Design a protein with these regions (language model features):
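Short alpha-helix
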Residues: 169-184, 190
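Conserved beta-strand signature within the Rossmann-like core of class I S-adenosyl-L-methionine
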Residues: 150-158
Length: 215
């Protein structure tokens, strides 16, 4: 029997029942005219459709569904059943990404009949700091393994309490970059927002693009 993955910090904050509330928050933002597709637009600017994109920690499917609508071949992975159920209910007839219920720290797409070799793996929405304690190294290794040589790992997460939910601890960029280097990733570029603004050390948020070694 395989070892059970530890509880993510997201699950500790929400009790695993936060899907509907999370979706409602973005629906409210969209209703005010705010752009809620910055992450998808960022990824689309990196690689043209029909590239393969893995949405790691896809939540309610907002990013994966948007990219699928833009012509990308998308797979969404989420461990929170309440979030993934919203994703499945939200998809339209023309937008049906493949959904996988799995923990990122133990992710093995072969077990779900999905081949690797993704062009992009995106982990938005504070996925990295909301991982279970002590799982950053193996999660980054697992995500790197889903990429083709030269594929991109794209992450966006808060760097201080103002940009993180609840009592979620900070994952420093130094720690994250070190783990990425060990996994065979090199930093290509870092921005301060999903809109591509310049990164400033004390602004509290970073969007990072790392590339898997081509060897």
């Amino acid at each position: 029997m395989s070892e059970q993955a530890p509880q993510t910090r997201w699950a500790q904050l929400t009790g695993g029942v936060g899907g509907s509330d999370y979706a409602a928050r973005f629906e409210a933002l969209a209703a005010t005219g705010q752009d809620v597709h910055g992450e998808a637009a960022f990824c689309a600017a990196l690689v043209p459709a029909p590239a393969r994109v893995l949405d790691a920690g896809c939540g309610t499917g907002r990013v994966a569904i948007r990219l699928h609508d833009l012509g990308y071949d998308c797979v969404g992975v989420e461990v929170d059943e309440s979030m993934l159920s919203v994703a499945v209910a939200t998809e339209t007839a023309s937008s049906r990404p493949d959904w996988v219920l799995a923990d990122l720290s133990t992710l093995d797409l072969d077990q779900h009949g999905i081949p690797g070799g993704f062009d992009v793996c995106v982990a938005a929405g504070n996925v990295i700091p909301l991982l279970a304690e002590g799982t950053l190294v193996r999660t980054v290794a697992a995500l790197t393994a889903t990429l083709r040589p030269g594929g991109l790992l794209v992450t966006g997460f808060g760097l201080d309490s103002a940009h993180l939910p609840g009592t979620c601890p900070v994952t420093s960029l130094a720690a994250y970059d070190s783990v990425c280097e060990v996994a065979g990733l090199e930093l290509l570029v870092r921005h301060g927002t999903w809109q591509g603004t310049a990164f400033v050390e004390d602004q509290g948020y970073a969007v990072s693009v790392h590339r898997r070694s081509r060897s």
